[in-house]
Amino acid sequence: MWCYRGGSISTEPRINDRIRVPEVRLVGPSGEQVGIVPLAKALELAQEYDLDLVEVAASARPPVCKLMDYGKFKYESAMKAREARKNQAHTVIKEMKLRPKIDPHDYDTKKGHVVRFLKQGDKVKITIMFRGREQSRPELGYRLLQRLATDVEDLGFVESSPKQDGRNMIMVLGPHKKKTEAMAEAREAQAARKAEAKANPGRSQNAADEDIPEGELPEGEVPEAETTEAAEAPAEASTEA
């Protein structure tokens, strides 16, 4: 509603007998063009079809009116607006900040966060922060952003290409919806299998053994030699310390 001089003017279109013009350009129920007809004729057709005559373009000359079920139209419009607000509210943009000369360990940590955000279905704004002389080397930021985009391309895509923003450089990654949904379904299926295995441990183990080809190890297990090597590694590291 628009307020004007203490009163109010409805933003809804004029319908039926509220339309005050001698003639209208009429559109039929299915969107077909009927043409310019007298208002009385348009109202008569609305009664024949048991529909409303709705003014959809008041500024046109003559105004454009359409035959429709106005109550149904309002309901569907309200539902679409509600769905749009709902989708907008669920859109979350996370932010990850990096330096152009980030060390490998920090890069892997930051990349892990980006992967997690994309798996959750969130967008991620990547910000490269330049300081001092780094501002004269924008190619460092481009390379880093391109590297990150390539590393996570299975989970997300570049929604907004790298661009300079003051002293920073930004890029926005969006999640591949189908892949994130598929991963969610896979996690649910895995949880269901674990629950079944917990409820029937003997039967689940037998079924798993039958599926393993001869000579191959179950998923998640490593050969004995590899296990021994992995176990000895910490001891060597401890000795060096």
Swiss-Prot record:
Keyword Protein biosynthesis: yes
Location of the region described as Disordered in the Swiss-Prot/TrEMBL record: 178-241
Gene Ontology MF, one: translation initiation factor activity
InterPro entries in alphabetical order: T_IF-3_C_sf, T_IF-3_N_sf, Translation_initiation_fac_3, Translation_initiation_fac_3_C, Translation_initiation_fac_3_N
Keywords on record: Cytoplasm, Initiation factor, Protein biosynthesis
Keyword Cytoplasm: yes
Gene Ontology BP term (one): ribosome disassembly
Pfam families the record matches: IF3_C (PF00707), IF3_N (PF05198)
Low complexity bias locations: 230-241
Localization (cell): Cytoplasm
Ranges of compositional bias, category Acidic residues: 208-229
GO (cellular component) term, any one: membrane
Biased composition (Basic and acidic residues): 180-197
Domain of life: Bacteria
NCBIfam families, sorted: infC
Family indicated by similarity: Belongs to the IF-3 family.
Quaternary context: Monomer.
Function comment: IF-3 binds to the 30S ribosomal subunit and shifts the equilibrium between 70S ribosomes and their 50S and 30S subunits in favor of the free subunits, thus enhancing the availability of 30S subunits on which protein synthesis initiation begins.
Protein name in the entry: Translation initiation factor IF-3
Organism: Streptomyces avermitilis (strain ATCC 31267 / DSM 46492 / JCM 5070 / NBRC 14893 / NCIMB 12804 / NRRL 8165 / MA-4680)
Lineage: Bacteria, Bacillati, Actinomycetota, Actinomycetes, Kitasatosporales
